[in-house]
Regions:
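N-terminal export/assembly segments and adjacent metallocofactor-ligating motifs
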Residues: 1-221, 255, 418-421
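Short, solvent-exposed aromatic-acidic interface loops
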Residues: 42-43, 287-289
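Active-site loop ensemble at the mouth of alpha/beta enzyme cores that anchors a bound cofactor
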Residues: 296-314
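Flexible, glycine/charged-enriched surface loops at secondary-structure junctions
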Residues: 279-287
Length: 421
């Protein structure tokens, strides 16, 4: 028989890229005769790399139990049996969309599972700061139309959001003059600033750390508040003047780049923003929660009132931002089974463990040697879906590039739920 492509929807004018925090919708995807997916429109290396991991040809990946190919029914039954025998499951990875997150929450409630994302520590950084002191947020639209001063904390945010400055209109006529500052940048950031400098109306500046990032942020906060600082660096004094004179200043950072106890840095920036808002306008945007983790946290919050690192246990709903850290639970032997979800990026694989493990995700994760493996469709590639954007204020629809032969995660999880006693 001649192998045929699954029904392709390439060339549609609407395609939302699910592979970074910005959820850009300015490109389309083309499917060639070999089934390869290529990006057309706005170029993005991140999206192109991700698309190379997919094909419009029917996948050969099959469910597995203990490394042996089986039917979906058999894999679902094995997963349900494993979870039923577990006294404390951990749901990790959490690379999925809204419908997958809703199904995960239902299964977590039934099994008493603790849920934490693959980069849970980075996700908790801003959450803990908000829980302790409150936060100031903004949106990409606000930054695009109003911000005349953008301060990047700990480097530019191009690792997780490659097109950040383009999405924010830096160099466009919406804001005639913008100044971009990087505090504690690297050589990569110098290259980004050099490129920004060539855009109309854009000036740039790089400020080295004064000791470490904690000290630098604390010094900046004190200067903005008008407190005396002995031997304050000239560069920070100049930045304070710019902040006070700006029409709308925005601090931007990637939480995964922050050191341990990074919530203190976020609190310091929030304190600075609060002081500035007494006389002008300022806000902060912390980028994190990629691969669907931010979306899952949003969904868990609206369903239960609690974010990730929570569980529905014998004492009711419990939230422990420190004790329910997945890495800590694994290291201390506090859980006895692992369900790992990674539908967007096969490189986000489950940690090495001797625990019974269920893996639901990209077909390439078949090599993870899980007790149970079920390949599922990726939202925005083989199936539709929804994700929250980086700023957390907008949920965007994802459109399928082709009709997948793999099941959606939500349907697999619902079948496991029905089969779990």
């Amino acid at each position: 028989m001649t192998e045929t492509l699954v029904t392709a929807r390439a060339g549609a004018t609407r395609w939302t890229c699910p592979f970074c925090l910005l959820l850009c919708d300015t490109s389309t995807v083309q499917v060639d005769a070999s089934g390869a997916l290529t990006l057309s429109g706005t170029g993005c290396a991140c999206a192109s790399r991700a698309l190379a991991r997919f094909s419009a040809r029917p996948t050969t990946a099959s469910p597995q139990v203990d490394g042996q190919v089986c039917t979906l029914d058999q894999a679902v039954a094995a997963a349900a049996k494993l979870l039923a025998a577990s006294r404390q499951p951990l749901f990790g990875g959490l690379g999925t969309d809204v419908s997958g997150a809703r199904a995960l929450y239902r299964l977590a409630c039934k099994t008493g599972a603790i849920s934490d994302a693959a980069e849970g520590a980075a996700l908790m950084t801003t959450l803990r700061a908000t829980q302790d002191r409150g936060s100031f947020f903004t949106t990409l639209a606000e930054v695009r139309t109003r911000a005349d001063l953008i301060v990047c904390v700990g480097g530019t945010p191009v690792e997780q959001a490659p097109g950040f400055f383009e999405r924010c209109g830096v160099g466009e006529e919406l804001v005639a003059k913008r100044h971009v500052v990087v505090i504690g940048g690297s050589g990569v950031d110098d290259a980004v600033l050099a490129a920004l400098r060539t855009r109309p109306g854009v000036t740039v500046e790089s400020i080295p750390l004064q000791g470490d990032l904690f000290t630098t942020v604390a010094t900046l906060s004190a200067l903005v508040a008008g407190r005396a600082v002995r031997e304050a660096p000239t560069a920070l004094k100049s930045l304070v003047t710019r902040l006070q004179q700006a029409r709308y200043a925005v601090f931007v950072g990637e939480t995964r780049k922050l050191p341990a106890q990074g919530a203190l840095i976020v609190e310091g920036i929030n304190r600075t923003v609060g002081t500035l808002n007494q006389t002008t306008r300022a806000a902060a945007m912390w980028l994190g929660g990629g691969n669907g983790a931010g979306t899952v946290s949003q969904v868990f919050t609206w369903l239960s009132g609690l974010p990730l690192r929570s569980r529905a246990g014998p004492l009711g709903l419990e939230h422990e931002p420190l004790c329910f850290d997945a890495q800590r639970l694994l290291a201390e032997g506090a859980i006895d089974s692992l369900l790992w979800v990674s539908g967007f990026d096969p490189d986000v694989a489950p940690p090495a463990t001797v625990l019974p493990t269920i893996v639901l995700g990209h077909p390439d994760l078949a090599s993870a040697r899980a007790s149970v493996f079920i390949p599922v469709s990726t939202p925005g590639i083989g199936s539709p879906g929804h994700l929250f954007r980086a700023d957390g204020s907008v949920m965007l629809p994802l459109f399928a590039v082709y009709e997948d032969t793999l099941p959606m995660l939500s349907s697999v999880l619902d079948r496991i739920l029905e089969s779990t006693p």
